[in-house]
UniProtKB/Swiss-Prot annotation:
There is a cross-link at residues 440, 672, 689, 700, 946, 981, 1085, 1218, 1297, 1317 (Glycyl lysine isopeptide (Lys-Gly) (interchain with G-Cter in SUMO2)). GO terms for cellular component: heterochromatin; nucleoplasm; nucleus; NuRD complex. Residues 1-41, 78-128, 578-659, 789-855, 891-961, 1094-1119 are annotated as: Disordered. The keyword Zinc-finger applies. This is Sal-like protein 1. GO terms for biological process: branching involved in ureteric bud morphogenesis; central nervous system neuron differentiation; embryonic digit morphogenesis; forelimb morphogenesis; GABAergic neuron differentiation; hindlimb morphogenesis; inductive cell-cell signaling; kidney epithelium development. Expressed in the metanephric mesenchyme surrounding ureteric bud. It comes from Mus musculus (Mouse).
Amino acid sequence: MSRRKQAKPQHFQSDPEVASLPRRDGDTEKGQPSRPTKSKDAHVCGRCCAEFFELSDLLLHKKSCTKNQLVLIVNESPASPAKTFPPGPSLNDPDDQMKDAANKADQEDCSDLSEPKGLDREESMEVEVPVATTTTTTTGGSGGSGGSTLSGVTNITTPSCHSGCSSGTSAITTSLPQLGDLTTLGNFSVINSNVIIENLQSTKVAVAQFSQEARCGGASGGKLLISTLMEQLLALQQQQIHQLQLIEQIRHQILLLASQSADLPAAPSIPSQGTLRTSANPLTTLSSHLSQQLAVAAGLAQSLASQSANISGVKQLPHVQLPQSSSGTSIVPPSGGTSPNMSIVTAAVPTPSSEKVASNAGASHVSSPAVSASSSPAFAISSLLSPESNPLLPQPTPANAVFPTPLPNIATTAEDLNSLSALAQQRKSKPPNVTAFEAKSTSDEAFFKHKCRFCAKVFGSDSALQIHLRSHTGERPFKCNICGNRFSTKGNLKVHFQRHKEKYPHIQMNPYPVPEHLDNVPTSTGIPYGMSIPSEKPVTSWLDTKPVLPTLTTSVGLPLPPTLPSLTPFIKTEEPAPIPISHSAASPQGSVKSDSGAPDLATRNPSGVPEEVEGSAVPPFGGKGEESNMASSAVPTAGNSTLNSPVADGGPGGTTFTNPLLPLMSEQFKAKFPFGGLLDSAQASETSKLQQLVENIDKKATDPNECIICHRVLSCQSALKMHYRTHTGERPFKCKICGRAFTTKGNLKTHYSVHRAMPPLRVQHSCPICQKKFTNAVVLQQHIRMHMGGQIPNTPVPDNYPESMESDTGSFDEKNFDDLDNFSDENMEECPEGSIPDTPKSADASQDSLSSSPLPLEMSSIAALENQMKMINAGLAEQLQASLKSVENGSMEGDVLTNDSSSVGGDMESQSAGSPAISESTSSMQALSPSNSTQEFHKSPGMEEKPQRVGPGEFANGLSPTPVNGGALDLTSSHAEKIIKEDSLGILFPFRDRGKFKNTACDICGKTFACQSALDIHYRSHTKERPFICTVCNRGFSTKGNLKQHMLTHQMRDLPSQLFEPSSNLGPNQNSAVIPANSLSSLIKTEVNGFVHVSPQDSKDAPTSHVPQGPLSSSATSPVLLPALPRRTPKQHYCNTCGKTFSSSSALQIHERTHTGEKPFACTICGRAFTTKGNLKVHMGTHMWNSTPARRGRRLSVDGPMTFLGGNPVKFPEMFQKDLAARSGSGDPSSFWNQYTAALSNGLAMKANEISVIQNGGIPPIPGSLGSGSSPISGLTGNVEKLGNSEPSAPLAGLEKMASSENGTNFRFTRFVEDSKEIVTS
């Protein structure tokens, strides 16, 4: 058709039909009034002014010419705006009448539901694909959809007639009910303007003008020439061949899936309200055939599409009931607007779907226009109803929704879901018989269109909404065809599939959704649907019982939107079956199943096949109301048969499946469409999927890398193995220096840096006894052990003194020695603090060793204390030396003293376990001579190696403190046998003769240690002895190493100047012995008690004669270098203690805790403290073993009743005592210790050493006589037995008291809770 522009185009009114045709002037509403035609034969195109002598030519031209959806339609009725065309055309002309009716209908529709119209158009287009396509141009709703049909039909009349025209047949054959009737029914107010601003779906146009008269005059439209309509329908049919093919495929599917298909085909008859004016013209026959096909497809499509369209359209329809139409076939027609909307296809469709609906729904369809709408081709009906349809209901073109490409279906599905939601909401407030679809504002619809009905989230597109919905339904439509894993999005599947590329390069990824229910459906090949290779996952047994589903036929494999299957589950669950309409058309089962109002069908769409049922039954589903109607009607009719016929069979008559299968089958069909037929997929049902997810929560412990205790899934077996250590407390990696154990080698390596930076050794690198210089701290420690072992004299050695000996004993001794040092607190903590059986040490060995040379271990306990005390008095340097000795061997400082003191200590300890310090000091004073110490050793066989041990042994006699962990000292030699080695060397170097000298077991708790020094230090955990006291703050420490480390916390200026003076002037034995004697005794006493203050008289007790003994004096004399001032000049983030620099203040702060021993983060469960919150969190994982899986995923709170764990620790007594003490001390083992039995066994519980630290750290010095059996300690510790029960609590309480009491000094209560880190409260 030429589009030549005439200089002076004229419209000849001579042809009233043409004159009456609305002129569509592009986007503007300029309807040019028809000019009087010069000749009645000439017809002018209102848009391009082209003249045609034949009306048919003009009509054909308009199809291509009138593409603009904005149509200016002149409303010739007085109510219409002034833009109405001149009255020239007579209404008598059939065309004019049709136009008038269409215009009126349009006006009403526009006035009431502008947007719904657009939706309706689209729907109608979809339904009446053949017709719609032709008219699409006019309507512009959805090209080639029902809407187009309407416009095509309307072209003659008006685009607004699209709804009526869509049902071209009905329009032609019968006069359509006036929309006015619907308006009255729907209580719609008619706007007097034929211009309506609405959001036309699938278009960019926002304004449409329709002739109200044309719409309203639809009743008279029946006079339209059938031939013209038929020609238009034919053209539309040709243009919509593809859609017809899709429809046909759907019909085949229905036939295959449901036995009801027979019913659907029966629908071909096209009853219409008025007698159909079918012309003999083959076009009529063709239209009827098309209508039949549509009826079949529409039956399904209507069930689905009309559900969606009708839901949207019906929703759009007010409470309109279609009284005019008979409950049966005229269901749709009843609405005045509806009839016109019903095209021939509509009329045809109404018969099967309408009749079914009518029969099933009965009057309900009438009562609910939605139902009737659904009964009529949902599309046409929707468009017809669109004026009344609810604009809020997003109306995906029903045809598109049902037949469109996957993408449209997806969008439609989302829209349908939304529509269903809207319907459900509307219906809630409407009478059951009345389909109340109230129009919502266009903005509301747009908003609601992409709004999640579960969480109310709004999305910018249907696809985004669809994907989001899967998060609620749990649907994962995309299946990996290699491993069977499912994904919610194709993108995720693509990413996952890359993993298989290497192993299966020849297998292509399946990009189509696979219904989830098919995963469990057995197939003839044994390979699950959607899988390229046999699945490793067994099929559920119940599914095995079901018939094998043959792969879907091509019809089944319609190129339906892959999303449909996924959507269907949503639809099923989310909305009544109607929502699934379009989607359900593709996979009706699913939709119907979940959404259908019918309890059976709707619920499970038991007739999994019921897609067809939906087709037939769906029609009833105009909205939820329709949905329910359809469910009821469809279920009874097609529904029942459908239920009986298995969808899987692929034939309507297929074997019936049990009801459970039907839903699955429906899902299968859904899946089938998307994936080259039916692809298997997991159950698509929302509820079933959610149910599976819930059920699987407790079944997921099958992951090979999942922790069976806390159900945490690790990345690999090695990670899992390390993770288990957090539960078991296993620490296989031990520090050779301090004996601390770690769960990973990396942590151990990190820990070694602490030793490298350890100020006491690193800064000095000189032997505190002989002042020999060493470049390696480890070598120095070994060297010190040699001193303690007697291999090297305890007198200052020339610088050139050979280090070979030191080296000899070094490694082994050093290891233990170091272990002793750091072990004392941290390591012991790691060891369980439990059983501490008394293990007598061989006294003989002790004696021998003592006599030959002071037993470093024994000495370390009490002697070391005395020596240290003396040294402290003499100078901090000496004290540090003693500390080193004591730390390494327990207290190696004064061998002689150690022997004596240990023996004495043993006595004193036995005297009063409560105040080991006092007893120790007394002991040391009493027995400085090796003989005494030897005797002491004899006293407690366990003390054999170390006199110190005697103290512990005696403590063991009197005290049975709470279990103390061996801590790092816990180098536990696997051999606990007590072998008394009388060799002084054996005693001195238990490490070397470990095999021979194995009596390194604790007499109290039975723990074995790698060396005597470790054992001696361990004993202090029982005795609470803290022989090493800080001269600055009077804090006591169990090992010299700890004291040295603590000294680093004091600024050099804080230390007494005497400490820096090497008391070398004093005779190695003489002076140091004398001076320290007094001070030492007092200090020792104080230290033992954990109190700095000691009465001078106590110091007097210490006989100077004892002090003179070489080893002691030498050690005392040998000046110990205090932590040297930082070698490096201060820098930013510079540690003043060790001179180490850090990149950040936080790192420095954490580092400083290694010097201060501060451990601000304590475990609220077991009380262990940590230097960093991260360590605490890791530690908290050790308690997970005692928690139920329910706690999984919950963050363990670092905060707890023990608020003191915070940066500003609260007083221990209140918090810790109440909590820990209450539990451990209360005697309710089940509440505290028992629950940590496993942990304790693995060193997770508090170590005795920790406890001792706590006691000592927090105990302010209280003056007491050396000989007095009672002391603050005694008060706190009582006896070992007491300690066992009350140690955690009593000491704390006492500590608090003491801390707040006498000592004017501010005592920091230190609790080495973990890894020798302290928690400090002041």
